[in-house]
Amino acid sequence: MKISDTLKNIFLYGNKYKTHSEAVIIACYFNPQGNPYRLIAFNKFYDSIKHLNHRIVECVIGDTQAELPETEFITRIHTPSLLWHKESLLNKIVSELPKKFKYVFWLDTDVIFTNKNWLVESVESLQTNNIMQPFEYCVHLDQDETDPSFNLDSYRISSRDPKLRHPKMWRSFCANHNESADLSCDVNYDKHGHVGFAWGARREILDTMPLYDKALIGGADHVMCHAAAGHIGHSCITKAFTENIKEINEWSTKFYALVQGKIGYVKGDLYHIWHGDLGKRQYLKRIQDFSSTLNEINEKDENGLYKTSVGGEYMEEYFNYRENTKTDAGSEPPLKITSKTDKRKDVIHKLGEIREQKSIKQNMSREEAYEHYKYYHPTRDDSFIESLVLGYLTNSTVEGSLLGGDILGAVIGDALNDTDDFSGGEYINDNFS
């Protein structure tokens, strides 16, 4: 680190994040639904990093209005397509960075670090690692919180135990990977650790292999972290990107060849600033639903952003639902995209959904699970799926067919109980990325 950096950190940045002249923070911001809490979160984030080297791009989608001022370090891009453009935007920023920056840190614009020295320590980590997360633990803050409402220290030890960890606290993927490769390879998200929020890498890694940019409804962080660890074809990814595995595996293999499993992290906590209900994000479901549509999106514009005329209704429904911050809005989850294989996929997804709901409530009786299902699914328009789920929940072909109206679905649902012990199973968190 240069002497000038040391002097700045001592005399100018006493209570701020410490700087490093060869490191740069990059980020992208888009808020097509005009969620006011997103802008509030951005302002808190930006106030914490504005004295550091940074480049931010705002993506203005459709006829929505820009929210950030254009400056030397904040630029603006327009696109008509409502997609998750995050990785495409980050890749564009990296391609235009001055060569003096050797270490690149891409952050979500809604995070705060408790470790004021995180940037300097992260650069130190990248002397021996190729990629890293600049935090050990992350916490989802509640609305209007500036600090967690619970004692973090009392939950650190149990953070890898799905049954004991605090529901708003995770250990980072990279911290778990450094402790044990078995932890990071686990199929349970809560065990392998959080994959999002903030990353850092040596510049040459991103120059050689740009971030995976085809996760156009999210999930690229999850793809990247398993790729960095050499988990090619990991079930976390295959169960989500059901139609794009070949392309993802090809990218992941090349990325791992560069990173070679050299993954680091630094001590400290990251706070995720509230800007909406986490339960509305539906990380896994949204990717599964959108997976087949990704094959139809291949064209890019002059800025390197994907453009499309398909999937727009689903994306708009999803973002409207996700970004609605009113507690009494009564909004519904987004529509499901239809395709040739939707019948089979819907059966698989719905069964998985019920299994996950049940595994979260491990002490729930079969009768309670049935009542739970009826409450959350009061009406259905597909008797086969209804009967399959009810046959599975009631463990009865007769009850499943009488209640759902399709004997074949009930038979299959009942039969699935032979291979799935209802009272067991592990907790599966839908927090995909």
State where each predicted segment sits.
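Low-complexity, glycine/proline/serine-enriched intrinsically disordered segments
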Residues: L335-S433
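A conserved acidic beta->alpha catalytic loop
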Residues: Y29, G34, S48, V57-L68, ...
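Hydrophobic targeting segments
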Residues: S21-A27, I49, N53-I56
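C-terminal catalytic/acceptor-binding lobe
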Residues: K2-H20, N31-R38, F45, A215-R355
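Short beta-strand-to-loop acidic/aromatic patch adjacent to the donor-nucleotide binding site
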Residues: F101-T114
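Short, acidic, metal-binding catalytic loop of nucleotide-sugar glycosyltransferases
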Residues: R38-H54
